[in-house]
Amino acid sequence: MRPAPGLSAQYPAAGPSPGERAEQRPVTALHGVGAALAARLARLGVTRVSDLLFVLPLRYEDRTRVSAIGSLQSGVRAAVDGEIQLTEIAYRGRRQLLCKISDGSGMLTLRFFHFSASQQQGLARGTRLRCFGEVRRGPLGLEMVHPEYRRLAGDTAALEDTLTPIYPLTEGVPQGRLRALIGASLRELERAALRDWLPAEAVLPPGLPSLKEALGYLHRPPREAQLAELAAGRHPAQRRLAFEELLAHHLTLKLRKRALKSDPAWELADGAGLTRRFLEALPFSLTRAQSRALRDAQEDLAASVPMVRLLQGDVGCGKTVVAAAAAARAAGSGLQAALMAPTELLAEQHWRSLRDWFAPLGETVALVSGGLPARTRRSALAAIASGEIRVVVGTHALFQAGIDFARLALVIVDEQHRFGVQQRLRLAEKGQKQGRLPHQLIMTATPIPRTLAMTAYADLDISVIDELPPGRTPVHTVVVPEQRRVEVVARIAQACRAGRQVYWVCPLIDESDELRAQAAEETAAGLSEALPGVRVGLVHGRMPAAAKDQAMLAFKAGRIQLLVATTVIEVGVDVPNATLMVIDNAERMGLAQLHQLRGRVGRGAEASSCVLLYRAPLSALARERLKVVRESCDGFEIARRDLELRGPGELLGTRQTGLAQLRVADLMRDADLLPRVQETAELLLASYPENVAGLAARWIGAGERYGRVG
């Protein structure tokens, strides 16, 4: 694969106009910005003067009116004028500077824990100040701690005529300094217009201002601006910037896909007919949705450009067998396929499934994981390097040095959000010895709503498996308060007597692995005592991988009836005999996590149940989450509601598209902009390619390389 070109290489920008030259000026061109301050500003993503314009306010404060001290209430933020009546150093636990000011209607204390001698001298008795800060009740009455203030020359001073922006800060750049620098950048904007990369014929959603108008408004909103609208991100000025930001991200993903498609790939013809024989040998038939997804993949695999396809579908929908059929096409073409799973446990489960499916065809499937005995590992690696073994399953160990493939034509990645882009790239690069890039099939059990998928995964083709195999019954879900815990334990005893198995998922009381392990151990001990005839096992994150796998395999074999676990089973083994799951402290978990956990039961023909055990009082958000999980087993509906409740960042996990770090846009809130974003992206790529690099540099960074895999 050729080195991935940057956007500027793919789409060189036109020569700079005077406005663009101003836009490219380094931030050190501003008065008072030396190397040290420039280094601090770089942490905010500011290297050019124009970058300051895109450091947008987090919120606004109304300093356009002065409040009487006597009318102040604790908890409000206010501007006040007053004369210093007393300044003193106090020692109440720590050294502090106290100033008492009065405006005739009341007295207010200003408290400073960090101050200099010159600051103390400047706050002399009789000095008039204008202060702004949060009012709170202190030991001496109402006070402000470290308020912003300035001295007043006369009895009064002009008030602010716009709302005051509050910007995100970085260490060493105080709010006032950043505000002044952005003000200087705005003055430059007045003198030399910022380049608007959107062409005149781009049809923006109605009511959106120009780029210059939008930036001016957001940095200096008039006093009559609607704070609620700005706080909600719904003002037309914000939507204008959100549109451009979404467009920049969408373009970069499309270019990543285009760059990838310019590389040659193996054309998998399957002359041996292995795919057909694989499907005929299966003990079940594919569903319509599985067949459709496989057809998509087969068409891609027959082409001479690399497939990069996302296979998404709910827990238990049968993604693995589709991936295995794609692997059969590679093997039938005399080439190799590798399936990479996020854990050794899941890798072994996939290996067992593929081993059984490929056995009737005489095709050996190798497992490569960290836990293999040295001799077995050496033998497997030699067979992979020679091409004798054509289907390989493993963990991240697959992309490590020392593992060589003869002719790797297909890379399958399970639970893609658990791997970074670079990990997938390293595995794909192992297939480039013959100058061809392997095809990639990326599986995820996180159903992504269509609108979000079209934007967040614009660099991938998408197949959806939207039905479960026949015989699967929906999991009956109930929400139960902690006070009925005894009834839940009795239900576990009943299930175990009937020969069924049970999961008990432990509460997430703390982020610490140690505390989670302790909670799991205490829960297991308590349940063992309450259920004397039941064989109880334990799995938590602090156990050695071998011990964890041993417990999970014992559960799968039926030697353990009740498995107490932390959320390490979220992606785990397939145990059709497990028909009951109890999720303790369910109110602490997110929708997607609850749905993923619930997917561990209901994998056989027997009716299954999930108990969501909660502790009161429930927040409104937690109540809504539990209600959604109780009412729906549809992963796509749950993902849609999850997106509404949490936003796209968490839903996408560590997906490295930058969409989780959007500065202005919000994929759920701004979903109505996306169709127009996609239209505008096509217009720019077709007719204004010289604008693409500038737009991406503004919102994402000129140094980013977008031709990467995945």
Sequence positions of predicted segments:
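Structural detector for short beta-strands of small beta-barrel domains
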Residues: 74-95, 133
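Long, highly charged, low-complexity intrinsically disordered interaction regions
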Residues: 1-30, 39-42, 249, 259
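Inter-lobe coupling/hinge segments of SF2-like helicase ATPases
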Residues: 292-295, 305-628, 687-691, 710
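Short boundary/loop segments of OB/S1/cold-shock single-stranded nucleic-acid-binding domains
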Residues: 58-78
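Short, surface-exposed secondary-structure boundary micro-motifs
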Residues: 83, 134-135, 586, 600
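Upstream accessory/linker segments immediately N-terminal to the RecA-like ATPase cores of bacterial MutS
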Residues: 37, 90-281, 654, 687
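C-terminal accessory region of SF2 helicases/translocases
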Residues: 605, 609, 617-710
